[in-house]
């Protein structure tokens, strides 16, 4: 169990993939980094939602009895968890580690890896236009998410169908050419 998460941490490092919304939805799978472990639960910074954090109560750490929470989660550990409740007014996100099947965890990790690649591709596209990654997200990244579902989908479409497929969706010719060149 610990070995899995240790590998997960070294694979992903501290690279952040962005989401187009401010708060996660209830039931959504999220990726976080545990930064504080207490006797009654753990706090994790959400990787996809900049500046947001989630609380995992000790009763949501494992389906079995938890004698010592540190046997299940450690600081700086990357975790995949399910959102139970979101309260934007209080700034709270409650999450669960135990309400996820292994296949869901694996699928989320694979999607995370793909989106990290896509973000790197977007960064390379931005550099070819002498722009920053933040500029890329503001100008085209969030729009690509709305149109294609995620940034990687836009790069797949550009690789398969060329820059015209992006311009037909309303992406500027400048960005369409840069994305197609990288794809």
Annotate the PLM regions.
Residues 3, 8-183:
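Single-stranded RNA-binding regions, centering on S1/OB-family and related RNA-binding modules
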């Amino acid at each position: 169990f610990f070995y899995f998460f240790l590998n997960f941490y070294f694979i992903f490092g501290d690279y952040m993939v962005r989401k187009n919304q401010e708060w996660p939805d209830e039931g959504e799978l999220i990726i976080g980094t545990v930064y504080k472990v207490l006797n009654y639960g753990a706090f994790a910074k959400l990787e996809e939602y900049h500046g947001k954090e989630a609380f995992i109560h000790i009763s949501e750490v494992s389906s079995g009895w938890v004698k010592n929470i540190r046997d299940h989660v450690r600081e700086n550990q990357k975790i995949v968890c399910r959102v139970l409740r979101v309260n934007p007014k209080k700034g709270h996100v409650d999450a669960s580690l135990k309400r996820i099947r292994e296949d869901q965890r694996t699928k989320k990790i694979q999607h995370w890896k793909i989106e990290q690649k896509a973000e790197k591709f977007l960064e390379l596209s931005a550099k070819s236009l002498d722009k920053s990654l933040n500029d890329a997200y503001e100008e085209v990244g969030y729009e690509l998410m709305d149109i294609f579902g995620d940034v990687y989908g836009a790069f797949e479409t550009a690789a398969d169908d060329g820059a015209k497929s992006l311009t037909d969706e309303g992406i500027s010719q400048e960005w369409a050419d840069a994305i197609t060149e990288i794809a």
